[in-house]
Amino acid sequence: MAGTEMRESMYNILICDDEKDIVNALKIYLNDSNYHFLEAFDGEEAVHLVDTNEVHLVLMDIMMPKLDGIRATLKIREEHSLPIIILSAKSEDADKILGLNVGADDYVTKPFSPLE
């Protein structure tokens, strides 16, 4: 019972990036005892994890295999209203505008600072 209560009080963050080093770096930057991290390495896996788990925040890369972050964000937005932050090396204004237009709440370019 206590374990279940602890799990429910955690803030679940889905990190979706095809680069394991980025996923690990984000987990280090965001290290907090109240965070539980889910990992996806492509957009299809990200959509599945959001559909099957209580996710409170998604950190989404754009350039990934199977389903890119733009399409994954669109699919997630069809059913969910949780915050999505795109983290991408694509830094053109058009990329940022597209990311925000498909439903991302913010867009941060890589490389990024933990303060961002």
Regions found by a protein language model. Name each.
Residues 20-38, 52:
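Two-component/phosphorelay signaling modules centered on CheY-like receiver
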Residues 39-57:
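Acidic, metal-coordinating helix/loop segments flanking the phosphotransfer/catalytic sites
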Residues 42-45, 68-71, 95:
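Acidic catalytic/metal-coordinating carboxylates
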Residues 51-55, 75-82, 102:
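Conserved phosphotransfer cores of two-component systems
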Residues 62-64:
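Receiver (REC) domain active-site loop signature in two-component systems and cognate sites
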Residues 112-116:
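C-terminal output helix
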